[in-house]
Amino acid sequence: MTAAPQEKGSSAARATAASLMVRYAVGDLELRHHAHVVDHRYPPIEPHETGMLDVGDGHSLYWEQCGNPDGKPAVVLHGGPGSGCRPGMRRQFDPARYRVVLFDQRNAGRSTPWAGEPEVDLSANTTPHLMRDIERLRQHLGIDRWLVWGGSWGVTLGLAYAEAHPERVSELALAAITSPDRWLTHWITRDMGRVFPREWERFRDGVPAAEREGDLAAAYSRLLHSPDPAVRAKAAQDWCDWEDTHVSLAPDAEPSLSVADPASQLAIARVVTHYWAHGCFLDDGQLLRDAHRLADIPGIMVHGRYDVSGPLDVAWQLSKAWSDGELVVVGDAGHSGGGMTPVMIEYLNRVADRRAGAEKTTCPESGPGS
């Protein structure tokens, strides 16, 4: 029997989500505004299998599987880069119909070595390394093709992976569309000061005066690798304070990074600035340039109308280049927000419904969830 979202059946959740949305069209773009937020996620679930995978270069990745071992395979790509997977990420998938794989990317979460240890070298942590890691994990688990779910940085990584290995991706489910291009790094670290001037000045003033007119991500990266623990700790706190400023639409949103323990702040700040200082190890414009490789991969892009961390133009340009991708803009969301979650769950349930229908056609005797 198909598991139900918390306190609601699957069909009821879809009906409730639909009733919460006011839909109106502008051209080909459907905008959805949620009157209020209801938790449509599935109940908390624990993994039924975990492990560590040696991927070379001295790195071992933590991975876990939850849900139905015979369900539709899906892999979750977390954000950051460097944030690691969280238990809530498991809850967007129907555990009766999905085989969900989560893993912590290099130097993140429970993978080793961890970036929160200041002596750890990040040189073997690049986008091409992560793409190879995804393939190694897929092969290790004996999965032929899988749905790729990515949020924020996970969108960038998921697109890069899908463009490199389209034959291994059945669908793309992307939330908070981002770009690895340097203009977006410049926007987040400098131009966004027009939106949050007081907070940005504090952020800018966290680096030496001689570096304040240059690449702020690179300047912070240098501070975060300082031999002085006090310098590292202050830089990590300043970076995380700035991240918390712009990732939420709600002015009274509860901070997350800025109140994390110092080692966790250091870990994510080191990895993020390492990537941003190197253009995310991708060519400028690469993901749009190679979007033709996504042909025949269906998917969804869920984006907040007021996402200042990733302006809507990024998702809009991708939607024009990816003909099989559906763009849904959530009117009450920023870079994250509860209004985005029911849209994503609705899509994931549609994908599972299609799989069940296809299997019933080819195997009429099969039962639900097979």
Sequence positions of predicted segments:
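N-terminal cap/lid segment of alpha/beta-hydrolase-fold proteins
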Residues: 39-60, 272
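Conserved hydrolase catalytic core segment
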Residues: 144-183
